[in-house]
Amino acid sequence: MAKKLLLSFLSVLFFLITTKVNSQKQINLDVDNDLYFNRDFYYSSGIFLSYFKPDKDNVDDLNRLTLGQLIYTPSMRYESNPEKYDYPYSGYLFLEYQKRKKMSSHSSYSLGGQIGITGNASLAKGMQNLYHDLVLNLPNLKWESQMPQELQLNLLASYFKGFKIKDNLNLTSELYSKLGTYQIMSGLERGLYIGDLSWLG
């Protein structure tokens, strides 16, 4: 039953992504998976389906709505004794809203919030085992002693600034923070961006 539900969910995602949208709007699907780098532990997977839409009252504001799922596993993922885990099994299913506001042609900030759930309701165990079954042909993970099922709330903030080096070559930086019941963190991302730099990051 769980496999059928997950396959249906993936089919709907594919349909949404391939559906043509107005050029002023955008749908993105981002997938993180550490098996791309031949490993599968700690931050194991992330799936993010996002919908972007300019604010109808101010074209310099961008609204983003994201449905996402995060999956974390211990390094010894086939170990059945939770006392030997170096990290708990954990899944997080969430809905996130952010509003990004333009500050200049190369900078912006965003504020937002996130509501989600951990535990069985996150669907993480089923999603990970389905991927292992269909794509990798690996045995199912037991998911012993996973993080309990609880409602989670987070506040989000970020600041983006781009620096033009020369035509179509730019440095980017983004300072971001999360504060709430699921995550408390802050970080700085730096990058090299090839293309026309904008305030969107």
PLM regions: where:
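Bacterial Sec-dependent N-terminal signal peptides
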Residues: 1-26
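Residue-level signal for the start and early helices of compact helical domains
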Residues: 8, 12, 58, 62-63, ...
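Residues in flexible loops and secondary-structure boundaries
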Residues: 9, 13-14, 37-39, 57, ...
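Short loop/turn segments at connectors of secondary-structure elements within structured domains
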Residues: 17, 23, 59-61, 105-109, ...
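N-terminal ordered "arm"
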Residues: 24-62
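Outer-membrane pore/translocation modules
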Residues: 27, 67-201
